Curated annotation (Swiss-Prot):
This is Centrosomal P4.1-associated protein. The lineage of its organism: Eukaryota, Metazoa, Chordata, Craniata, Vertebrata. Belongs to the TCP10 family. Residues 401-410, 680-690 have a biased composition (Polar residues). Forms homodimers. Associates with microtubules plus ends; binds to beta-tubulin subunits exposed on microtubule outer surface at its distal tip; also associates with microtubule lattice. Associated with the gamma-tubulin complex. Interacts with the head domain of EPB41. Interacts with LYST. Interacts with CEP152 (via C-terminus). Interacts with STIL. Forms a complex with STIL and SASS6. Pfam families: Tcp10_C (PF07202). The gene is CPAP. Residues 542-551, 636-651, 718-765 have a biased composition (Basic and acidic residues). Residues 78-99, 190-211, 387-415, 437-480, 522-552, 612-790, 846-903, 1088-1158 are annotated as: Disordered. Plays an important role in cell division and centrosome function by participating in centriole duplication. Inhibits microtubule nucleation from the centrosome. Involved in the regulation of slow processive growth of centriolar microtubules. Acts as microtubule plus-end tracking protein that stabilizes centriolar microtubules and inhibits microtubule polymerization and extension from the distal ends of centrioles. Required for centriole elongation and for STIL-mediated centriole amplification. Residues 896-1338 are annotated as: Interaction with STIL.
Length: 1338
């Protein structure tokens, strides 16, 4: 029906966090190390622990829970009934009760081994079960059934008390048998575990739930085969029979372990051999009947308290389970057990530890040879080892010390381990602190050996912390090892073992060694812690105190070690989680109060308050508290020696001390290493004070000694231990011993409250939470919850949500809190009511015992509406379970010495105080409501005023806007007027301007007068010149007439000359040689005749000079005409430089006309005319007038040829410019360059090398070189070059391409790349450096 937990299930505890993220208030943070079973499940945690310890995979947690509740009560009945056949019946009762299918001894053994394993399953299974169970518990009629089961359980607990006596007798008988069996089976870790299981089974008749839980807590893998389990069961039965009380106490411890099964599994593994030896020693040294009776009475009371506390712790574990996704620690498994069962088991374990302490003291230390093997690290453990350096240091220390002690003390160390483990659990089960007076005695002895143990304890604690990282494994191993010795202690050892899961592989001896050294360490560190729980338990159970007095030192050290280990482990995990959170926050989250990371940390701290501290670095709540915690830790050891007396003397002081330790728990957490060092340095004082603190506030002792490591391990148990610690504080003066009277505690708490008003005091808030949980348990869970809620009202909404978690977890924690008392108490309200920390805390330590007893008594009363509102799970279930658990605890307290009464008194006082504060809160709430109404009215008035003001403002703004517009219009008008005025002012001249104007006017008048005078002159001159012009015109006319006459004369003379020449031609023919001379002579004669004629004719003219002067222009015109008529005649001026020729020319001159402007015109016989201008220019006109040659004064020569060609010679540049009639212009330069400008705009330039360049009008150029190369330049700048060999080149801005006649094309790009395409299709590409990039050869 129910399968044993598999390794995956065992590991599922690590994954349970993902299953518990449904609660928004938990915000992804696991509030408690224990699995988040319903708050209703808190009370049923004992049953649930039993059932969950049995791996119930397919069962809904809610169903299994109700079933377990029924089975829990049934188990108790069956165990009571099965007292005689302890081994089979207890097995059956446990098995049958837990799960009917598990009825056989082997199965029971498996179940016993399974508990730790199943606790791991709880870790794995509980997440599912817890979530499902919470949902089912809220929705399922299981709540009603649970309440009924609680009532039945109370009845059955009473029956159990009666049956326990009978069972004790039977156990005594079977103990003797089992002692013989155990003596042979002690060496076997399974056997040692089996006796514990059996003893638990025998206890289970008294503590049916406890025994079953113990059985469930033991991992099934501890005993792989049923025969082993049977042997284990038989050994456990014998061991339990021999140490029934211790087993009962161990059951209580186991219950705590169930709360943190990993720790207990380790603790059990480590303590299993120790318990075996201790059981043997106890069986040998102590009459089984007496020890069993005393232990049984204690167990009965503790079972009831453990049931309540286990329920609370179960709840607490549910809270703890919410802390965060990290390696689940042993505390988770512990929380699975119901608080009552857990308390019972712890009580039994503590009693057994006391017995074992006595046996150890009597027999001496048992050498622990094997060094506990360390299991594989689980998720988060790798970092956790480093984050919890303290825990590791203690672990290493423990292991070393354990090795030393193992040689020195085997059984005593085993006892000390158990007791210390139980103390650790006792921290969880604060009731165990009642035994601290006795434990103190032993813790003194332990303080001696515990000092070594203390040093060892850190090592073991470190190992346990590592194991706590892998809680399920730790639990299982612890269960294996410690089961044989005593299941209660095994549960503590489970916690320890879960912490020391690494040590588990070496099973009994390694674990025992770890436990021993760890117990020693705890004896130093944890002796106070376990002493506190022990004193509480002692206060509740005088029999257990008697038993514990013998085992007190061992139990105290063991419990303290367990607690320290668990706390360190939990703290290590929390630190690891916080470290991971910090890393995550550094990457993703901004550190704001509203950030999810901060909320996670706060919730984690709340959950730490509930079960563990999240922060790797201890929160520094109050340095003052931390310092007191250090003195306490320093004084704990010395006080631990006197802790019994002090616990008796000042139970109240323990509460204040516990309060202070609670308040300083965070400080201790903050300074855990220092505190631990200080505690370890002054271990005697620290142990004593730790014992007081364990009684007062395990969290303080945990905080001070191993505040982080122990808190890691102990936070879950610390919840129960808080409750127990509260009750034991109240019950045990020793608990109050360190702090002084309990009243002082409250006073200090009030002061602390004032100090703790800083929200950082998580111990205080944990005290508040434990106080609230106690309140919830005690008077009225509803009222206390409402009270705590009212206190929490002072906190923010997050505090409320935390409160919800804390309250729900508190109900769980109430049981756990009674067990753990301070640590959990410190934490839950730490988060919940930071503001109310002081109040809650003050009340919490004061009423922790009362609330514990009252919560037990008043679990039945309905939870307050406030609590129900915030914690619906608390509505039905926490009442019945918590009430049932509280009643047994109250009964136990009643059965126990006046310490319980004092504790219940203190709880009642706390409840009264809480009620008073609630009234205050109500009054304050009323006043706040009035203030709120007043504020709302004031706000309404303010809104009206604002509206009126807005209206008025709008009106004013409109009016102002109108006024503004009007003013703007006025300003515009004024501006226009001003502009006109300024314009007029600018136009009106000033004095200087007027003077200037006057001066200018005067000047203008003067100029006008001058102008008139000049005009008169000009007019006279003009008239005179006009008359002259007229006269010159007349003269010109006369001269023209003369020219005409002279022209006629010239023509006549020329004709005569021709006639003469014609007559001379004959002679020329005859005389060729003389012809030229004659002709010249005739010309000369004719010239002379003409000249004579002219001379004769000219004198006859009236004004020959004028005629001569006026004639040249006519002659020039006639010469021009003549040359135009004969253009073919070459220009003569350049051709006649020779003076002789001039002479001849002079001879040929027929006439010479001098013009008035200085121009001289010469007429030659051949009809040519030469005109000499005054500036040196000479113009020659041919006879026909077609050829005209003009030689300018600067040397330039212009020739007009008969074909209309115009040749102009530039002398300076030696360039000839020839213009043809068709418009062609040819320029001949001196360099030989010839330019031709065609009419269409084309230009042809022929260079001296015969290169021809053609420039076209469209911008193209063509150059033809002598070799035949042609270069054409396109308009876009591209050049096309055609070579005479047929190659062609194209030059562009991007590339240059050459095309060869064979079809090869070579392209060179601007970047230097060359591309060659061959006719065959081959392409070769080269880079600028000539490297071939591509070459495709076809």
């Amino acid at each position: 029906m129910f399968l044993m937990p598999t390794s995956s299930e065992l590991n599922s505890g690590q994954n349970f966090l993902t299953q518990w993220m449904t609660n928004p208030s938990r915000a992804g943070v696991i509030l408690n190390r224990g699995f988040p079973i319903l708050e209703a499940d808190k009370e049923k945690r004992a049953a649930v622990d039993i059932s969950t310890s049995f791996p119930i995979k397919g069962t809904h947690f809610s169903d299994s829970f109700s079933f377990i509740n029924e089975e829990d009560s049934l188990l108790e009945e069956q165990k009571l009934e099965s007292n005689s056949p302890y081994k089979p019946q207890s097995d059956k009762s446990e098995t049958h009760t837990g799960f009917p299918c598990i009825k056989k001894g082997p199965q029971v053994a498996a179940c016993h081994s399974a508990p730790g394993h199943q606790e791991e399953n709880k870790n794995d299974f509980i997440p599912h079960l817890a979530s499902e169970f919470k949902e089912g518990a809220y929705k399922d009629p299981l709540f009603k059934k649970l309440e009924q089961l609680k009532e039945v359980q109370q009845k059955k607990q009473e029956q159990l008390k009666r049956q326990q006596l009978e069972q004790l007798q039977r156990l005594m008988e079977e103990q003797e048998k089992l002692l013989t069996m155990v003596s042979g089976q002690c060496t076997l870790p399974g056997l040692s575990l089996l006796p514990d299981d059996q003893s638990q089974k025998h206890r289970s008749p008294g503590n049916t739930t406890t025994g079953e839980r113990a059985t469930c807590c033991f991992p099934s893998y501890v005993y792989p085969d049923p025969t082993q389990e049977e042997t284990y069961a038989s050994n456990i039965l014998s061991h339990e029979q021999s140490n029934f009380c211790r087993t009962a106490h161990g059951d209580f411890v186991l219950t705590s372990k169930r709360a943190s099964p990993n720790l207990f599994s380790e603790a059990q593994y480590q303590e299993a051999p120790v318990e075996k030896n201790n059981l043997k020693e106890e069986n040998r040294n102590h009459p089984t009947g007496e020890s069993i009776l005393s232990c049984w009475e204690k167990v009965t009371e503790q079972i009831q308290e453990a049931n309540d506390k286990n329920l609370q712790k179960h709840d607490d574990s549910s809270e703890v389970a919410n802390i965060e996704e990290r390696p689940i620690k042993a505390a988770i498994g512990e929380r699975k057990q119901t608080f009552e069962d857990y308390l019972e088991e712890q009580i039994q374990l503590e009693e057994q530890e006391l017995k074992q302490k006595q046996l150890k003291e009597a027999e001496g230390p048992l050498p622990i040879k094997a060094k506990p093997k360390q299991p594989f690290l689980k998720r988060g453990e790798g970092l956790a080892r480093f984050t919890n350096a303290k825990s590791k240091f203690q672990k290493g220390k423990e292991s070393k010390l354990v090795t030393n002690q193992s040689t020195s003390e085997d059984q005593p160390l085993f006892k000390m381990d158990r007791q210390q483990l139980q103390r650790k659990t006792a921290l969880k089960n604060k009731e165990l602190c009642a035994d601290n007076p006795i434990l103190k005695k032993d813790s003194k002895a332990r303080t001696k050996s515990g000092s070594v143990t203390l040093s060892q304890k850190p090592k073991m604690l470190k190992c346990s912390n590592r194991k706590s990282l892998s809680p399920s494994g730790l639990k299982i191993q612890t269960g294996k090892k410690c089961d044989g010795q005593f299941r209660d202690q095994i549960k503590f050892e489970k916690k320890v073992t879960s912490n020391n899961k690494e040590n588990v592989p070496e099973c009994p001896k390694p674990c025992d060694t770890g436990c021993t050294g760890w117990n020693k360490t705890q004896g130093k560190d944890r002796l106070p812690l376990s002493t506190g729980p022990a004193s509480r338990l002692a206060a509740k159970s005088p029999i257990r105190e008697t038993m514990k007095e013998s085992e007190s030192s061992l139990d105290v050290s063991l419990q303290k070690k367990l607690e320290t280990w668990e706390r360190e482990k939990e703290k290590e995990n929390l630190e690891l989680d916080e470290f991971l959170f910090l890393e995550q926050a550094a990457d993703e989250i901004s550190f704001s109060s509203n950030s999810s990371f901060v909320l996670k940390i706060l919730e984690r701290d709340q959950q730490i308050c509930k079960g563990h501290r999240m922060s790797s670095t201890p929160v520094k709540a109050v340095p003052q508290k931390t310092n007191p915690a250090d003195p306490i830790s320093h004084c704990n050891r010395s006080e631990d020696l006197d802790h019994t007396a002090r616990e008796k003397e000042s139970e109240c002081e323990v509460a204040p001390k516990q309060l202070h330790s609670l308040s300083s728990a965070d400080e201790l957490r903050e300074q855990p290493c220092k505190i631990r060092k200080a505690v370890q340095k002054s271990t005697s004082e620290n142990q004593t004070e730790w014992n007081a603190r364990d009684d007062e506030g395990v969290p303080n002792s945990d905080s001070s000694t191993n505040s982080e490591e122990q808190l890691d391990v102990t936070i879950k148990p610390s919840t129960e231990d808080r409750e127990r610690g509260i009750s034991s504080r109240e019950d045990s003066p020793q608990v109050c011993d360190d702090k002084g009277p309990f009243k002082d505690t409250r006073t200090q708490e009030d002061k602390r409250r004032d100090v703790d008003l800083d929200l950082s005091d998580k111990d205080y808030s944990s005290d508040e939470s434990s106080m609230e949980s106690i309140k919830h348990k005690v008077s009225e869970p509803s009222r206390s919850s409402s009270l705590s809620m009212s206190k929490m009202d002072f906190d923010d909404e997050r505090t409320w949500t935390d409160l919800e978690e804390n309250l729900c977890n508190h109900d769980v924690v109430l049981g756990n809190e009674s067990t753990y008392g301070t640590p959990q108490t410190c934490y839950p309200n730490n988060e919940i009511g930071i503001l109310d920390k002081t109040i809650k805390r003050k009340i919490a330590p004061v009423k922790r015992g009362e609330d514990l007893s009252k919560s037990r008594r008043s679990r039945s009363p309905p939870t307050s509406e406030l609590m129900m509102k915030f914690f619906p799970s608390l509505k039905p279930k926490p009442k019945s379970d918590s009430h049932l658990g509280n009643e047994p605890k109250l009964n136990i307290n009643q059965d126990q010495p006046p310490g319980d009464n004092a504790r219940s008194q203190v709880l009642r006082e706390k409840i009264i105080e809480l009620e008073t504060e609630i009234e205050k809160f109500k009054a304050e709430n009323a006043s706040l409501a009035k203030l709120r109404i007043e504020r709302e009215s004031a706000l309404e008035k303010l809104r009206k005023e604002i509206a009126d003001f807005e209206q008025q403002k709008a009106k004013e703004l409109a009016r102002i806007e109108e006024f503004k517009k009007e003013e703007m219009r006025k300003l515009q008008k004024e501006r226009k007027v001003f502009e006109k005025y300024t314009t007029a002012a600018r136009t009106f001249p000033d004095k200087k301007e007027r003077e200037e104007i006057q001066t200018l006017k005067q000047q203008i008048a003067d100029l006008r007068e001058d102008l008139k005078r000049k005009e008169t002159k000009w007019s006279s001159t003009h008239s005179r010149l006009r008359s002259q012009i007229e006269m010159l015109v007349r003269e010109n006319t006369d001269l023209r007439e003369e020219i005409k006459v002279m022209e006629r004369f010239r023509l006549d003379a020329w004709k005569r000359a021709e006639a003469i020449e014609s007559s001379l031609e004959v002679e020329k023919k005859d005389k060729l040689a003389n012809t030229x001379v004659r002709f010249q002579n005739s010309q000369i004669s004719s010239g002379t005749q003409v000249e004579k004629y002219k001379k004769n004719y000219l004198p006859m003219q009236g004004n020959p000079p004028r005629r001569s002067k006026s004639a040249p222009p006519r002659d020039l015109g006639s010469l021009d005409k003549g040359q135009a008529a004969s253009p073919r005649e070459p220009p003569e001026p350049l051709n006649f430089p020779d003076p002789e020729y001039k002479e001849e020319e002079d001879q040929d001159i027929q006439g010479e006309i001098s013009h008035p402007d200085g121009k001289v015109e010469k007429v030659y016989k051949n009809g040519c005319r030469v005109i000499l201008f005054p500036n040196g220019t000479r113009k020659e006109v041919s006879a026909d007038g077609k050829t005209i040659t003009v030689t300018f004064f600067n040397g330039d020569v212009k020739q007009v040829m008969p074909d209309q060609r115009v040749i102009y010679y530039y002398a300076a540049a030696q360039t000839t410019h020839t213009t043809y009639p068709e418009g062609l212009e040819v320029l001949h330069f001196s360099s030989g360059q010839i330019e031709k400008h065609y009419p269409d705009g084309r230009k042809e330039i022929t260079f001296p090398d015969q290169t021809v360049k053609n420039l076209f009008p469209d911008g193209q150029e063509e150059s033809i070189f002598p070799d035949g190369t042609t270069v054409r330049v396109q308009r876009d700048g591209n050049k096309l070059i055609e070579f005479n060999n047929g190659q062609r080149e194209l030059h562009t801005a991007q590339f240059k391409r050459r095309e060869y006649p064979d079809g090869t094309v070579k392209t060179v790009y601007a970047n230097g790349h060359q591309e060659t395409k061959y006719r065959s299709g081959r392409i070769r590409v080269k880079d600028k450096e000539g490297n071939v990039l591509m070459d495709t050869e076809l």
